[in-house]
Amino acid sequence: MAIFGVKVADRPAVQLNIGQAGTAITSARAAVQAGCAETDARIEAKITPTETDYLRQLGYSVTAIRLCDEAMRLLLRVQGGNGLREGSSFERRYRDFQAMPLHINAHPDRVAELVGKHLLGVENNAPFQ
C-alpha cells in the first residue's frame, strides 16, 4: 500500500511505531515466560507460593498487559484514520483488549496497591490466601 507514492513500510514513523510495538510485545512475552518458569520451578520443587510469590506473579501479568496495551496503541497509531475507516478487525480487537485489565485479577490499580503495601510493609486488608 502506498500513500502519496510512498510505501507505508518505508515511512519512518511507521517503522518507529512498529519497532516500538514489537519491542513491547517481546518484553511482555518475557515477563509472562519468567512468571511461568518461576511457577513451574515452584511446582516441581513442591513449594507452596508465599504472598511475595503471589504478588510477583500478579506483577508479571499486569506488566505484560500494560506492555501489550502500549503495543496496541502504537499499532492503532500506525493504522490511522484510513485503517479504521477501511474496517479491519483491529478496532474490535483493540476494544476487546481494553476490557481485559478491567477484570479484578488484572486491574492495575488493585495489583499496584497490593504490591506497594507489601513492599512498604503496610498491612494488607485483603491478605493472600
What are these regions (language model features)?
Residues A2, E51-T52, P127:
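Short linear motifs at secondary-structure transitions and domain/linker junctions
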Residues N82-Q129:
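Glycine-rich phosphate/cofactor-binding loops in nucleotide/flavin-utilizing enzymes
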Residues P12, D69-E70:
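A generic alpha-helix surface/boundary motif
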Residues G19-T26, L58, V62-D69, R95-Q98, ...:
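Generic structural signal for well-ordered, non-transmembrane alpha-helical segments
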Residues S27-V62, R73-L84:
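C-terminal helix-coil-helix/basic helical segment that borders enzyme active sites and/or dimer interfaces
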Residues V6-A9, A13-L16, T23, A45-G59, ...:
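A structural signal for alpha-helical segments
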Residues M1-R42:
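Extended amphipathic alpha-helical segments enriched in small hydrophobics
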